[in-house]
Amino acid sequence: MAIILASQSPRRKELLRYLVTDFLIEPADVDETIQPSDEPEDYVMRMAQAKAAKIAAHHPADIVIACDTIVVNQGEILGKPVDRKDGYRMLRALSGGVHQVFTALVIRQGGQITTALVPAEVTFFELTDEEIQNYLESGEYADKAGAYGIQGGASLFVKQIVGDYYSIVGFPVG
């Protein structure tokens, strides 16, 4: 029996390695299109379940771990930015305000499915255009929900966190 992380996220890989040293990585490619009618909590759980199901279909006896993370700002679900302009739009919208982060965790083995939805709240300082442009220039924004990674350069944007830090990173291990 193998443990499979259904993610290509280096952050999730690093955090799982603290818990288990021997696991496989098999990213799940699923359609992450956000529909206008999607509720944030339902959407993020549906994505994590879809990723777990896709990998579990090929590995029914193994343990499959999948996660999905979204940022929600004033009711808008912010997934990964499509380009730098979208990243700028997201960071500008988050600047000086409070937003929510939801990470859904799904663990599947055979017919057994365990799920968790872990919320957190993040307050950003007011960001200058120069700060946003410098961060975008680093490239860190590109593969992250809400266009930022709290464990990187964007940690300087954070005024306050309420909830699970690791949920914001994308893998709630606490």
Task: Locate each region found by the language model.
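A short, surface-exposed loop/turn module that caps and links secondary-structure elements
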Residues: I34-D38
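A short beta-strand-loop structural module common to alpha/beta enzyme folds
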Residues: L24-T33
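A local structural micro-motif
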Residues: F23-L24, K144
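Cofactor-binding loop segments of dinucleotide-utilizing enzymes, especially the Rossmann-like FAD-
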Residues: Q8, A28, G110
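N-terminal beta1-alpha1 ligand-phosphate binding loop
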Residues: M1-T21
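Anionic-ligand binding patches
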Residues: I3-I4, E39-G174
